[in-house]
Every structure is written in structure tokens, then in C-alpha cells.
Amino acid sequence: MATKNLHFETLQVHVGQEQADPATDARAVPIYQTTSYVFHNSAHAAARFGLQDPGNIYGRLTNSTQGVFEQRVAALEGGVAGLAVASGAAAITYAFENITRAGDHIVAAKTIYGGSYNLLAHTLPSYGITTTFVDPSDLSNFEKAIQENTKAIFIETLGNPNSNIIDIEAVSEIAHRHKIPLIIDNTFGTPYLIRPIEHGADIVVHSATKFIGGHGSSLGGVIVDSGKFDWVASGKFPQLTEPDPCYHGVRFVDAAGPAAYATRIRAILLRDTGATISPFNAFILLQGLETLSLRVERHVENALKVVNFLNNHPKVKKVNHPSLSSHPDHALYQRYFPNGASSIFTFEVKGGQEEAHRFIDSLEIFSLLANVADVKSLVIHPASTTHSQLNAQELVEQEIYPGTVRLSIGTEHIDDLIADLEQALAKI
């Protein structure tokens, strides 16, 4: 099956298993629940371990179920290679660790997910890797923050939790002018609504736990390598361009070509630190991927109706959603998301934390939990949970206040969702 000209909805079902399983004729992707793989002979084993022959070596590095998932996500994002790992946090960590060393620096939008913020602000500095966080509403802040030792710029297609939008193409131009890659978290955007590589991103990461899986049942993360960044011409990334002693002097740019970045993560970081996705989780995430477009359409449709309801409610102080003409990122929303977006967003109830908690505790359909992008509608109070590790100043910088509530709008009937929100607001 030629996949080059197929539509997204077809690719999400078929890529990676265009024909039935060759060993069993099974049409569904099998769960290859194994730790190891038999080599044809000693020479074959040596070639695999020396990166001279692609294929399975050991379950910590590769698995055939995982491989289908990786190919499919890479195809949907328009990249040359994908790498699935145990969680979105692992994907983001590897994305940075792959091209940084002690003494290096990263520039990141300050509006990113709290877990990513903690990684960059507190964990990576203990390894000697520092980050400057910038206000992304002024693009010049990115350029001002770049230093001689800066190795990447990091942003999200839709900020977590406020769904702010950054001009990807403008930030990409800044990054490339300084010969560094742009890494984008597209968890909230999804490749169905936006493909960051088409707008200049070099590396795309996902928490596959969210929209890709879609049902709150399995953890997973994925990294997609665009294959477009010229690591050699940059001259800043010896990890990819100079001989690697682990593989007897192999240069990843020679051994893997355009997929050098993704290959090094698998061959070095995954080998040494082992944040491996299980075959079963890869299988479950594949099931979710097959209906991604259908679910996202309903998520967005419902979300826009909820936004309209909340925006006109007397007990709501503010709704943070880029579809609103009053939102500062509305023009970028129209430009980058012509089919709509952002079923995960925040709003402020009038009052403060007490009123926010009472509202949340009065909801009946919405589940109070830390996940998002489930078919079930979800709610949480960011300041006291997901972003509670931030100090007061950091919370204000991320526009998270005592009355802020985050909603993740699911696929239930819209009338039921609005009725639930209405009765809960009546309690405050």
C-alpha cells in the first residue's frame, strides 16, 4: 500500500501494518510480548549490535508492536522516525538530554506544562543544564535569551493549562538563525489539528497518554524526528556528528542519516536509562490512534460550545480560550488551527480558591483527576495540584490564580456537560 498521498484518517489506521501480520495473518497488530529476539547467526548478531543492520536486538530498545506505533505517529506528524517511550515525561527528558551536556543551556516558553517546567527549572540544572524561561507573547524574548551554549528552544503548540499559542514559524526562524533546533510539544495540538514540522519544528514530542491514547488507560510518550535539521552544518552537536566511543567510533549522522537524532536516543539513552514502553501499552495506544481524528473533532466541537456557555455566565470572571476574539492569541488561533482546537483550557470563577473548590466538588459528570484529553470530561484546580510546586510568582507568571479551573472537555453529549457545569456554578 502506497501511503504517500493518503489522507490522515487512512494513515492513522494503516501505517506500519499495511498488510496482515506476516507470521500469523492477523489483521490487528499483534502484541509481541517478548524480551529478546533470535539472531540468524553470530555475524547477524554482531551487525545488529554494531548498528550496521537495523532490527530488533532486545526489548529495552525495540519491539515489533512498538515499531508499528512509532511508524504511524511519525507518518502522521510528517517525520522520518519516531521513538516511543514509557511516558510523555520520558519523551521530553530524552528530547533535551540527547543534545545537551553539562554546561549547556535551553530557552523555553514560561507557559509550558508544570511538569516540563519543573524538569527544566529544577531537575536538569542538577546535571549542569540550565534554562531561561521567557514570556512568549514577545518573540524578541526568545532571541534575547539565546546564549553561546544554547542548544534548543522549547515551546508547546497549545500551552498547558491556558491554551496560549505561539507563532511557531517565527520562533523556528529565530532558532534556525542561531543554528539550534526547535523542539515542540504537540500533545494538546495533536497531528490531526496541526503538524508542527510543516511550520518549522525540528523535533516533536507527545504525551501519548493524552489524545493519542484517548481513554485514560495507558501511559506512553513519543518523539518524532523531522529529519530536517542539519546537525553537521550547525556545528553545535558533537553527540551526533563526532565518533561515539560506545559504538567503536560510529557517527550517528553517518549511520542513521536524517534519523540521527532519534537513532541516538534509542541507541544511547534508552539503552542506558531504559524508559521503555511496554508492548501492551503500545498496542493500547495504537487502538486509540485509529480513532484520533473522530475523537478530536468531537472534543473540539464540544469545547467551543462550553467556552461560549462559560463566557456568558455571570459567575465566571474570565475564560482563557484562543477561539474568543478577545483572546490575545486569537489571530494565531485562526492561522494555525483553521479546524479549531483546544478542548483543554482554563477559566476563572469569581471569588477565589474556595469558590473554585466548591464548583469542582459539585460537578457530577466531570471527573476530578490529573489526566487530560480523555473521552471523559475532566476537571482540576491547577494551583493546588498540577502546578502546586510552583511558587506564588511563578503561578502568576503562568496566569494561574486561586480561582483558576482547568477543564478537559470529553465526547459526552454537550447538553449533559453544560447542565453539569450550570448546576455546579449555581452552588458558588
Residue spans for each PLM region:
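Conserved N-terminal alpha-helix of the aminotransferase class I/II PLP-enzyme fold
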Residues: 41-93, 115-123
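Conserved small-domain helix->loop->beta segment predominantly found in fold-type I
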Residues: 273-276, 280-282, 287, 291, ...
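PLP-dependent enzyme catalytic core of the Aspartate aminotransferase-like
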Residues: 9, 80, 121, 130, ...
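Short hydrophobic/aromatic beta-strand micro-patches
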Residues: 224, 346-348, 408-410
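Conserved PLP-enzyme active-site core in the AAT-like
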Residues: 2-3, 16-20, 83-312
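N-terminal "arm"/small-domain region of PLP-dependent enzymes with the aminotransferase-like
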Residues: 2-63, 71-72
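Active-site beta-loop-alpha junctions enriched in small/polar residues
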Residues: 158, 187-189, 324, 350, ...
